């Protein structure tokens, strides 16, 4: 969902994925460029070449640390996931020499009033041109356990709606 939202606010979006067959799908959602995460040299220096204006990181771990070292001056990084690890290995250099900001996103504890305000903003002000084309599927709650392996193996693209009825 990050690619269409960023595209809606007129930023050039580079989507990064480890799924080699996802390029056309991500470009359809608004990515100007698609790069393979597995081909990125994460480096180990306190500051690497400044590449990104900002980042939305779903993975955490080494990738999040790399983003802190490669975001351009005054860029923001939104950390929204931890699938690649809980640890963050970096220095203070990106924060004090480049003014990079790291924003932790906790969507679970958001008060109801703020949640409604944010969803209204997304629905009315940040509508991406291809939002209806985000891949999605619906499964019954009873089928959830058998669906998990595909997620663990990285074979799922898009969103899954669990029907509780």
What are these regions (language model features)?
Residues 116-165:
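C-terminal hydrophobic helical "lid"/dimerization subdomain
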Residues 26, 62-130, 163-165:
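Glycine-rich phosphate-binding loop and adjacent beta-alpha segment
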Residues 34, 102-104, 138:
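Conserved beta-strand scaffold positions in the cores of enzyme catalytic domains, especially
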Residues 1-5:
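Rossmann-fold NAD(P)-dependent oxidoreductase module
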Residues 17-18, 38-39, 58-59, 83, ...:
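Short beta->alpha linker loops
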Residues 15, 53-56, 76-79, 104, ...:
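Short catalytic-loop micro-motif centered on adjacent basic/acidic residues
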Residues 8-63, 120:
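Adenosine-nucleotide cofactor-binding segment
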């Amino acid at each position: 969902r990050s690619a269409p939202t960023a595209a809606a606010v007129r930023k050039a979006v580079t989507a990064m994925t480890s799924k080699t067959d996802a390029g056309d799908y991500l470009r359809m959602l608004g990515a100007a460029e698609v790069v393979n995460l597995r081909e990125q040299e994460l480096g180990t220096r306190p500051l690497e070449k400044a590449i990104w204006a900002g980042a939305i990181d779903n993975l955490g771990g080494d990738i999040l640390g790399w983003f802190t070292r490669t975001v351009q001056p005054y860029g923001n990084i939104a950390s929204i996931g931890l699938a690649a690890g809980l640890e963050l290995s970096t220095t203070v250099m990106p924060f004090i020499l480049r003014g990079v900001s790291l924003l932790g996103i906790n969507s679970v504890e958001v008060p109801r009033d703020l949640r409604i305000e944010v969803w209204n903003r997304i629905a009315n002000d940040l509508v991406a041109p291809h939002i209806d084309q985000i891949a999605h599927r619906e499964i019954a709650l009873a089928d959830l356990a058998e669906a998990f392996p595909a997620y663990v193996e990285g074979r799922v693209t898009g969103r899954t709606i669990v029907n509780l009825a």
